[in-house]
């Protein structure tokens, strides 16, 4: 099984540069605006799109992403509408990978088999489900693999050598290394330690390793890019969108322009870093 994720990372490896993986919340601040943001991300420099599935109890997310999820839910976003976003995006872009990220509850309520069928039909390439450990692979991971959808695992600084093989077992697409303990949007990690961790994980897998949590600026993204196959940025993009909304969460400025400006700057920085390192 070769997915768009596999193809994209193979292309980037051939180019000698890491991926910029961009996260935003589906339906934030509303469906129409969020879809415009999604469609604009690849042109701004995003290599992979993480599409957030809003959920009412997002335990791993910091205040910014929690607020984005709440705005989306208040605007009527559902899992079906998030899948619709993927399908609409695919009408214009058949190459940029889409990874849906969130929690298991909405998928369980939707129905696993129905969800995987609809996700595949909508052009979704991968899943990150933060509250499903490897011990529960039979719930979603293995059915996703059978449906041709990558299942991407999170590893953390506390994932020890005993735990790591279990985390990597049945993983596909890429490995998401959470560069610190805590919630999304926390402070940036020590880049030297990140490099050490990535090298350690690479001893156990051939999958690309992307690093996220705490990456907010182009400079931070560049620092992480020297150590990883990809850099994940989420909270900063969500904040850029939020900065264009009024106190009620409605659009007052231009969230699409704000998000794409940031992504363009991040992409320029990430791409330049690897090129400099290769010279």
Curated annotation (Swiss-Prot):
Pathway: Amino-acid biosynthesis; L-tryptophan biosynthesis; L-tryptophan from chorismate: step 5/5. InterPro entries: Aldolase_TIM (IPR013785), RibuloseP-bd_barrel (IPR011060), Trp_synthase_alpha_AS (IPR018204), Trp_synthase_suA (IPR002028). It catalyses: (1S,2R)-1-C-(indol-3-yl)glycerol 3-phosphate + L-serine = D-glyceraldehyde 3-phosphate + L-tryptophan + H2O. It comes from the Bacteria. Its EC number is 4.2.1.20. Signal peptide: none annotated. The active site is at residues 50, 61. GO terms for cellular component: cytosol. The keyword Hydrolase does not apply. Belongs to the TrpA family. This is Tryptophan synthase alpha chain. It comes from Brucella canis (strain ATCC 23365 / NCTC 10854 / RM-666).
